[in-house]
Structures are given as structure tokens and as C-alpha cells.
Amino acid sequence: MAWKAPKIVEVPCGMEINMYVSATRK
């Protein structure tokens, strides 16, 4: 992953990880 991406891209990525973790815990 390119860490040069702006925070605008980091936020959606974080939300996807959150949803993924929630789905796996269920």
C-alpha cells in the first residue's frame, strides 16, 4: 500500500477494516 495517499483515502479504508472486523467477530 502507498502511504502517500491523503487521509481522504485512509478514512474509507479504516471503515472497511472496521466492517470486516465486525463481520468476522459475528
Swiss-Prot record:
Entry keyword Ribonucleoprotein = no
Q: Which Pfam families match?
A: PqqA
**Alphabetical keyword list:** PQQ biosynthesis
Q: Where is this cross-link: Pyrroloquinoline quinone (Glu-Tyr)?
A: 16-20
Task: Enumerate the InterPro entries for this protein.
Answer: PQQ_synth_PqqA
Gene Ontology biological process terms, A to Z: pyrroloquinoline quinone biosynthetic process
* Pathway, per record: Cofactor biosynthesis; pyrroloquinoline quinone biosynthesis
UniProt superkingdom: Bacteria
Q: Which HAMAP family does the protein's record reference? A: PQQ_syn_PqqA
The UniProt similarity line reads:
Belongs to the PqqA family.
| Function as written in the Swiss-Prot or TrEMBL entry | Required for coenzyme pyrroloquinoline quinone (PQQ) biosynthesis. PQQ is probably formed by cross-linking a specific glutamate to a specific tyrosine residue and excising these residues from the peptide.
Q: What is this protein called?
A: Coenzyme PQQ synthesis protein A
Name the encoding gene, please: pqqA
